[in-house]
């Protein structure tokens, strides 16, 4: 029973303390009365139920059900899942320093982080992990969650990893001393052309802002005059990271966003004018996977007329969560406020309390309605607002880009879709990488590796591989999808052998969104233009109107 009582106490202290510290004394208290039926019920079950019951397990199941009656983003995270849920945003975690995939119930090391613990111990990309701390680790017990549990651990602790190396059947054992492994938010930064710097950001974590400054300094050394920030498929993260980023590009006293909730008075976030890149022409890329903090940044740039937004309509998450930890290290993320862009719009898409079904299907619904392929399919149901120079923007459903670029469907046949959805493309790419690693290790640059792969007839090799695994060969569809298949296969092998930066550089070469970005910069159109004033009616025109 101590854990049950702890829940009541901790909710009162932690949530109450947070609100008293951050929201001007508006304190949230847990209602503690004789009608606290949930607490009484748990006591009754523990004291009188016919069989012994794990009360902690009941609580783990009850809390998500309670939160499910709220908005779709108020969630419970169990203690065993908490570390994985926060590692990406923390900036680092303690582990061995490998990227891996699980194939045929075995861990395959995909990449070894440079200068990380695993590399220092002697592990190589391509190694198959078959034992951890002297115990076999193969078969059905091998899952992502279990692998993380065994390989992660406190800094400076040791773990023995048994591997089978390519070309050998002998198990070699390496002792790895765990260390801090950085988790990067900025996954690519390079020059698209002689004038245009490009930065891809995958989320907004503790280190996103300093990582971006390092990337900008690198691009400055290369003489960039334009900047493209790619937030496509960026699911968000910490609000403060987005605010700090936006501040770098805005003049003084510009509103970045404000937050407001039932128990939290309005809080404005203003720029201080100390950023170093306030005048550089800029484009921000978004799509339906851009959410939360990514939308905060894009909305601040759009509403302040600071950058041109290119891509497709963003996800539409305009709610702010506070993370609260329980004594057992489980978490809840509770929605405490909404955020509003500088024009006053909340871009949260509609939802129904306690019913997340339609909400979770929203992106599929957009796809089926043709929104990914035609700007005319975007239906604005929220109110209209105006940017600083008078451009119309809309609330209630994500950020609509200034320039729409449809999803590229060239080569998207039923054969390609099945190959992709079945996982066969990823499986083939990894198998090819593993089988040809000695040769592929000779290529250290993306272009060199891409040129080599172009000569290997990978599409034909894939068709044979897929046919043996149940995807029937369809030559006409394969020909129609040849270029797309070749590009995707190349990109996955490049990712396996090099890194995410190399993968990004490769796919951007043939990306219509990147082409549109460069067109905007070449036309000196990155700074939004003030809308033309409506033409004044002539006397003749006014007479015609009256006759109607």
Per-region residue spans from a language model:
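Hydrophobic membrane-insertion alpha-helices, especially the h-region
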Residues: 2-20
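Cleft-lining beta-strand/loop regions that shape enzyme active-site pockets
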Residues: 15-34, 38, 42, 46, ...
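Polar, glycine-rich mid-to-C-terminal structural blocks
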Residues: 293, 305, 312, 316-383
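Conserved functional hotspot residues or short segments at active or partner-binding sites
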Residues: 346-347, 351-548
